[in-house]
Amino acid sequence: GFDFETIRSDVSALKRWLETELGDEDLAELAERDRGRFRLAREVLSRPGVVEWLRLKAALSVDLVRDWRQAIDAVDPDKLLMSHAFMPPWTVVTGLDFSGVAEFSDAVSPKLYTMHWAQMVTFWGNELMAQRPELNERLLVRALISLLDMFDGTPGDPGGESLADYRYPEPDEPHPV
């Protein structure tokens, strides 16, 4: 079972931290490639309901694919079920449990197209900036793209500096992922 009250409380607390307490000093730490991941883990682990929420999402993804498998088998058991999934780190947030889904799928295919990932940076960044306009946009962008592993940090792949650098690319334009 799941502790829904703790899920509600802790996910709300994490949302409140992001919307009302997150500061530039937090963003600077989150923007660091390794240290940022530890900071994010610390924020999540200090709220056990967030981990429980992620477990719930994973269980729901397995239940959904199990139900699809049963529906397909009821009509034609020879039909294949091919599940599609975002790649990590998105699988953690979306709740996809590769091993659980694989039990009921004939294949699990990663979504390798990443054009829209940049829009996720823009969406999340705009939402946080709307809640906290005093945040440093450059630090926010660096934190988001670091946590989402969207740049190498090398001279050839330094990552963008503003939310405007992250949008759906034109067909002939390289995208920032």
Predicted feature locations:
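Polysaccharide-binding and catalytic clefts of secreted carbohydrate-active enzymes
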Residues: 1-176
